[in-house]
Amino acid sequence: MASIATLGSHCSLQVLKGAKDEGLKTILVCEKKREKLYRRFPFIDELIIVDKFREVLDEKVQSTLEQNDAVLIPHGTLIAQMSSDEIESIKTPIFGNKWILRWESDREMKEKLMREATLPMPKPVTNPSEIEKLSIVKRQGAAGGKGYFMAANEDDYNTKRNQLISEGVISEDETLYIQEYAAGVLAYLTFFYSPLKEELEFYGVDQRHESDIEGLGRIPAEQQMKSNKVPSFNVIGNSPLVLRESLLDEVYTMGENFVEASKRIVAPGMNGPFCIEGVYDENAQFTSFEFSARIVAGSNIYMDGSPYYNLLFNETMSMGKRIAREVKTAAETNQLDKVTT
């Protein structure tokens, strides 16, 4: 029987607790500095202690994972710590589609896939000189919002970019992505596509809390205008959200379109968990500005099951447990090749 492995960060506790609930062995690749934390949790069967997560690329670590018939569950830390080439070189079977993680990390590829899926998107801005209205500037990959900033025009862009460079938040040669800012209620829509059942499941919705942009509302406008600090969009945590029921049909349609587009563009497609991220405007119209092609940290708020998964399963079902069940079913039916790459 396969075991479940992941990096000790992001959503690893949820992933491994779900795997243990499904009766699978659990393995955590853990940095030394976090060993004390993860030793607290009895559902973690084995810790592989490393100095840096990049050691998962080493033959020694991959050999240990192979001996345990491990399936590696990717999350945001894997993408943030390693290049797409490095992730694709990992010999350990990766749950889902490791090739699509490159499309998540590269902004231009990401935009292409979202357009193929006919997701409504903000207008991209190809050059700072073309900023005509409030825009948001983003880094490549899974940066967790750190180093993002807003700009009203080219001068504003250059001032804030230079300040973040001087503070060491971004590098001078870093490629930044600009898109017009979409205002509304933040909604991060999480799905699970099962290649075994060929079925899409809507898991739930969360909102992300970002510092220190969320704290600015408590500062009087006079003091805000005198401050030279560039606000940060660093994600600190998440909270649950339940949508109006009338919005759910469109939610499923967007998820299905994304799955089908992924099959056409980056085989074998969007298998496993993914998230379409955006905002609802005053007319309840959704605009999508991102996608994540793997489990997201927002799923941590539903470790006892989400409202929408409670409608599909007559048991407590976290995303970690859902992943483990897919792996377990695939292993029992000799179909692991359908759920891993």
From Swiss-Prot:
Its cofactor is Mg(2+); Mn(2+). It catalyses: 5-amino-1-(5-phospho-beta-D-ribosyl)imidazole-4-carboxamide + formate + ATP = 5-formamido-1-(5-phospho-D-ribosyl)imidazole-4-carboxamide + ADP + phosphate. GO terms for molecular function: ATP binding; ligase activity, forming carbon-nitrogen bonds; magnesium ion binding. The keyword Ligase applies. It holds the Pfam family DUF1246. GO terms for biological process: 'de novo' IMP biosynthetic process. Keywords: ATP-binding, Ligase, Magnesium, Manganese, Metal-binding, Nucleotide-binding, Purine biosynthesis. Its EC number is 6.3.4.23. Mg(2+) binds at E277, E290. Catalyzes the ATP- and formate-dependent formylation of 5-aminoimidazole-4-carboxamide-1-beta-d-ribofuranosyl 5'-monophosphate (AICAR) to 5-formaminoimidazole-4-carboxamide-1-beta-d-ribofuranosyl 5'-monophosphate (FAICAR) in the absence of folates. PANTHER family: 5-FORMAMINOIMIDAZOLE-4-CARBOXAMIDE-1-(BETA)-D-RIBOFURANOSYL 5'-MONOPHOSPHATE SYNTHETASE, 5-FORMAMINOIMIDAZOLE-4-CARBOXAMIDE-1-(BETA)-D-RIBOFURANOSYL 5'-MONOPHOSPHATE SYNTHETASE-RELATED. This is 5-formaminoimidazole-4-carboxamide-1-(beta)-D-ribofuranosyl 5'-monophosphate synthetase. The lineage of its organism: Archaea, Nitrososphaerota, Nitrososphaeria, Nitrosopumilales, Nitrosopumilaceae. The gene is purP.
